[in-house]
Amino acid sequence: MSDAPAHIEERRPHILIVDDEEGVRSAIRRTLRKEPYRLSEAASGAEALELMRSDPPDLLLTDHLMPQMTGLELLQRVRLYYPDILRIVLTGQAELETVVAAINDGEVFRFLRKPWDDTELKLAIHLALEHQRTTRENARLLELLRAQADVIKRLESNHPGISSIRRDASGAILIAEDERAQPDE
C-alpha cells in the first residue's frame, strides 16, 4: 500500500482483454503482469459488452476472429456505445480488408498481428493510454479556459474597461488615477 493519500494516487488504467482462446488471454496477462494496469478479460464479444456495462475499461484489446461476434462487430458496438474506450486489435488475420474495416468502422488505435512482440504490445498500450490521458487533460483545460473567459466577460460587462491595459511609450503599464483622489479644477 502506498503512503500517498488516496486522492493523490493515480488510478490504474483498466484494460479488457477479449479473445476466445484462454491461452492467448493468459499470455497477454503474463506480458502485462508487471505493468501498472488493472486487467479483466472476456472470452467473447457478448461477455465483453456485459462486463463493460458495469465496469467500462479504458482500453479494449480484442481478437478479430471469434465465434458469435467478430472483433470488428465488437469494435463497432464499442465505438457506438462507449466512444471513449480506446480500441486495439490483436489478431492472426491481418488481411488488408480486415485492417481497413477495423480502422474505418472500429476506429482502432492500433492493429497488431499475432504472434505479437511483447515490447510492441506494451508500447502500443502505453501510447494509447498516454493519448487518452492527453486528450482528457486537453478537454479539461479547454473547459477551464472557457470558464475563465466567461468570468472575464461578466466582469467586463459589469465593470467596463476592467480588462483593458494602457501602456506608455516605453511599454510600462499605466495605472489610472482614482477620480476621487484628483483635485477639483
Language-model segments: what does each one mean?
Residues E41-E50, G71:
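Helix N-cap/capping motif at the beta->alpha junctions
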Residues D55-L61:
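Active-site beta3 strand of CheY-like receiver
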Residues W116-I125, L129, R133:
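C-terminal output helix
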Residues M66:
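Receiver (REC) domain active-site loop signature in two-component systems and cognate sites
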Residues R140-E185:
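C-terminal output/effector regions of signal-responsive regulators
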Residues E50, L72-D84, A101:
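Short amphipathic alpha-helix used as the core "switch/output" element in two-component signaling
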Residues H7, H14, E22-S40:
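Two-component/phosphorelay signaling modules centered on CheY-like receiver
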Residues D19, D63, T91:
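Active-site residues of response regulator receiver
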